[in-house]
UniProtKB/Swiss-Prot annotation:
Its main location: mitochondrion. It comes from Fusarium vanettenii (strain ATCC MYA-4622 / CBS 123669 / FGSC 9596 / NRRL 45880 / 77-13-4) (Fusarium solani subsp. pisi). GO terms for molecular function: protein folding chaperone. It is found in: Mitochondrion matrix. This is Mitochondrial zinc maintenance protein 1, mitochondrial. The keyword Transit peptide applies. GO terms for biological process: mitochondrial respiratory chain complex III assembly. Belongs to the complex I LYR family. MZM1 subfamily. Assembly factor required for Rieske Fe-S protein RIP1 incorporation into the cytochrome b-c1 (CIII) complex. Functions as a chaperone, binding to this subunit within the mitochondrial matrix and stabilizing it prior to its translocation and insertion into the late CIII dimeric intermediate within the mitochondrial inner membrane. Modulates the mitochondrial matrix zinc pool. The keyword Ion transport does not apply. Signal peptide: none annotated. InterPro entries: Complex1_LYR_LYRM7, MZM1/LYRM7.
Length: 116
């Protein structure tokens, strides 16, 4: 792998795992082992494969950092959870949900057809 970009991707991935799994040492430890194993496996791939692997690692780090939240059950016997949403968690504006029922569709029917 390309040394500097691979090292940066490795660090970003480890940091993202720490953010995503903060407070859950068992899951964090398993994630770190998985990250190490994946990078060791790909240590001797060619430059074409290396750039794809680095890109994949950066994308995984982004998903971990922005889209993974932890939930802890609030009461036994109830299906309610307290979510740990942190500063890096992506928060959507729900625009697609707000406009979904407005009737402003561009296509129509299956696969953009006229619904006939």
């Amino acid at each position: 792998m390309a040394t500097v970009p691979a090292l940066n991707a490795y660090r970003h991935l480890m940091r993202a795992a720490r953010i995503a799994f903060q407070g859950d040492t068992q899951i964090l430890s398993a994630a770190q082992v998985q990250i190490r194993n994946e990078f060791r496996q790909k240590a001797s791939i060619d430059s074409t494969g290396a750039s794809a692997a680095i890109q994949h690692a950066e994308e995984v780090a982004k998903v971990l950092r922005e889209n993974v939240v932890q939930g802890k059950k609030t009461e036994e016997g109830k299906d309610t959870y307290k979510l740990r949403i942190h500063e890096h968690t992506e928060r959507g504006d729900n625009e697609s949900i707000l406009t979904a029922g407005s009737g402003n569709t561009t296509g129509g029917g299956c696969c953009g057809g006229g619904g006939r």
